[in-house]
Regions:
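Acidic, contiguous segments within the catalytic cores of piggyBac-derived transposases
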Residues: 1-390
Length: 390
C-alpha cells in the first residue's frame, strides 16, 4: 500500500492539477483513472495524514541540548545521502551551491534568496557532479543559533560537503560566497583542488590586482592581471566590469589563449580573451542549477503546512534524479526522464488496488459449488428453504 501511495505522489508530479481532490473528480476532463483506480481519496488522505518518518515520542524537547529541528526527517535524509554516495562514482569536476525548497509558512530556519527562482523556503547546501547534476551530498541550513551569526559559515559548509572526497583530487567549483584564499589552501592540503569567483575584499586576497577606476580606464575588455602564491593563482579579469577569481587548478595563462563568447554591440557574439579559470568556471559551476532544472520539470513538491514533508518531497526528488542518472549509464538504450518516471510509477502500482466495494458486506455464507453442475448433464433447480425477496 505504501508503494502505491508513493507511486501516486510521483504520478501527481507528472500530471499536475491545482488541488489533490481533482484527481478523483467526476469531471471527465480532470478525472485520473490511474489514481482513482488504486485507492479512494479518503484512503490517500488518511495515509498522508498519519504518514511519519520517525517516532515523534522519542524526539528531544526544545530546551534539550540534543534538540533537532529536522528530527522527523533526519534519518530519511541521511539514508538518501548514504545511498547516493555508495552507488555512484563521481567524475572529477564537482560544484557547490545552494538550492531552495519552497515554503512560505512559519519556520525558524526559513530563508530568503533574491537571485533564486524560489525566493522563500528551506535552504540546502548541495554538492553536485558538474556534468550531470548528480546530487552527492546535501545539508539543510537550520539558521543561526540564538542571535549570534556563525563565524566562517561558508568555510564550514565546504569542509562538511567535501569531507568524504578528500585525497581523491576532485576539482570543486564554487561562487564568491564560499571562495577565499585560506579555504583553498586548506582544501589543497586534503588533495582537493578548487576554483571560483571571489570577493575583492576577502582577507588575504592580493590588493595589488584589485582594479581601481583609473586602472579600468587603461584596460581593454579581456585584459587581466594575476599573481600567485605556490599553486594558488589570483586573477583580476576586466569584462564589462572587474571579475575576480582564485584557483588551485589552473595556470594564469594557456596556449592557445583562452577566450569566452560575449554579446557584442555590433550584433554577433565575439570571443573575449580571459584566464583559463574563467572558461572552466562557466562550464562546471552549474551542477546544482542543472539538478534543480531537471527536477523542476516534473516536481512533486506540493503545498504543506509541515516543513518536514517538504523535505520528504525533496529527498524523493533527489532519489529519482540520481537513480535516473545511474540508469542512463548502465542502460543499453537510455530513455528520457518522463518515461523513466512513468516506469517507476508502473512498477510501484502495477497489480495493486485498494478500493473497497461499495455497500455492506454480506452476512450470508458463500454457497458451496455442487460438483454435479460440472458433469455436462441437465439438473433441476434446487429450491432453497429460505427464499429472498425479489
Amino acid at each position: 500500500k505504501m508503494k502505491a501511495f508513493v507511486g501516486i505522489i510521483i504520478f501527481m508530479g507528472i500530471v499536475k492539477l491545482p488541488r489533490i481532490n481533482l484527481y478523483w473528480s467526476n469531471d471527465v476532463l480532470l478525472h485520473q483513472e490511474p489514481v482513482s483506480s488504486l485507492m479512494s481519496q479518503t484512503r490517500f488522505r488518511q495515509i498522508w495524514r498519519y504518514f511519519h518518518l520517525a517516532d515523534n515520542s522519542t524526539a528531544p524537547p526544545r530546551d534539550h541540548q540534543d534538540f533537532d529541528k529536522i528530527y522527523r526527517v533526519r534519518k530519511y535524509l541521511e539514508l538518501i545521502k548514504a545511498r547516493s554516495q555508495a552507488l555512484y562514482r563521481l567524475s572529477c569536476e564537482l560544484s557547490i551551491d545552494e538550492t531552495m525548497v519552497p515554503h512560505k509558512g512559519r519556520l525558524s530556519y526559513k530563508q530568503y534568496i533574491k537571485n533564486k527562482p524560489i525566493k522563500w523556503g528551506i535552504k540546502l547546501w548541495v554538492l553536485c557532479e558538474a556534468k550531470t547534476g548528480y546530487v552527492n551530498k546535501f545539508q539543510v541550513y537550520l539558521g543561526k543559533e540564538g542571535n549570534a551569526a556563525e563565524q566562517n559559515l561558508a568555510r564550514r559548509v565546504v569542509h562538511d560537503l567535501t569531507q568524504h572526497v578528500q585525497h581523491k583530487y576532485h576539482q570543486i567549483y564554487m561562487d564568491n560566497f564560499y571562495s577565499e584564499p585560506e579555504l583553498f589552501l586548506q582544501l589543497q592540503e586534503n588533495d582537493i583542488l578548487a576554483c571560483g569567483t571571489v570577493r575583492q575584499n576577502r582577507k588575504s586576497f592580493p590588493k595589488e590586482i584589485v582594479l581601481t577606476k583609473q586602472m579600468e580606464k587603461n584596460m581593454n575588455r579581456g585584459d587581466y592581471l594575476w599573481c600567485c602564491h605556490g599553486n594558488l593563482v589570483a586573477m583580476a579579469w576586466y569584462d564589462r566590469r572587474p571579475v575576480y577569481l582564485i584557483s588551485t587548478i589552473h595556470p594564469p595563462a594557456s596556449v592557445p589563449p583562452a577566450s569566452v563568447q560575449r554579446a557584442s554591440r555590433r550584433g554577433p557574439r565575439e570571443d573575449i580573451p580571459c584566464p583559463p579559470a574563467q572558461v572552466d568556471y562557466q562550464k562546471f559551476m552549474g551542477g546544482v542549477d542543472l539538478s534543480d532544472q531537471i527536477c523542476s520539470t516534473f516536481s512533486i513538491i506540493r503545498k504543506s503546512r509541515k516543513a518536514w514533508k517538504k523535505l520528504f518531497y525533496y529527498g524523493l526528488e533527489v532519489s529519482l534524479l540520481n537513480s535516473y542518472i545511474i540508469y542512463k549509464q548502465v542502460a543499453d538504450k537510455p530513455t528520457e526522464f518522463l518515461l523513466y518516471r512513468l516506469a517507476i510509477v508502473r512498477h510501484l502500482t502495477e497489480g495493486k488496488c485498494f478500493r473497497q466495494r461499495p455497500g455492506r458486506p454480506s452476512t450470508r455464507p458463500l454457497a458451496e459449488m455442487d460438483i454435479r453442475r460440472l458433469n455436462g448433464q441437465y439438473h433441476s433447480i434446487a429450491i432453497e428453504e429460505v427464499r429472498r425477496n425479489c
